[in-house]
Amino acid sequence: MNTTSQQYDAIISICRELYSKKMKDYGCAWRILRLPSLTDQIFIKAQRIRSLQENEVRKVDEDEASEFIGIINYCIMALIQIDKGIADQPDLNFEEGIRLYDEKVALTKALMENKNHDYGEAWREMRVSSLTDLILQKLLRVKQIEDNKGKTLVSEGIDANYQDMINYSVFAMILMGKDNE
């Protein structure tokens, strides 16, 4: 049986491959997006997942997994934006874009491992729909923090919320068996 760390890496490998291909196709055009724009893109993906979970009929041939991949990659882009700021023009070459991606993944995986140790892998007993709801809750929190110009009184910042959404998405994909594909 794979360890959580190995399963995590397998999911991230799928996401990184798509990110890499899109970087080759489009460059880093996403660097012009402000954080609320990225948050809205993530929200659209999460709402779509919830809709797929609730509806039997699908009119677009995409599944939950592709939307979770989108959430992961958009959250990583948001973490990069937090550190680098918004660019007026695309300003990252392919290698730098991949390096920053890997850096954000490493930090987020370390957070997961620390929380996983403390919570005893409780996520393994959760439903994918519950993880989707937690992602939507995090998005509502992020939107509120953005509306408050990034200020919080007692809560964690936007970056921690993006990291949690990445980890919840990875967990959902593991529960769906996508780490074995």
Residue ranges and their predicted role:
Residues M1-E181:
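Intrinsically disordered, low-complexity regulatory regions
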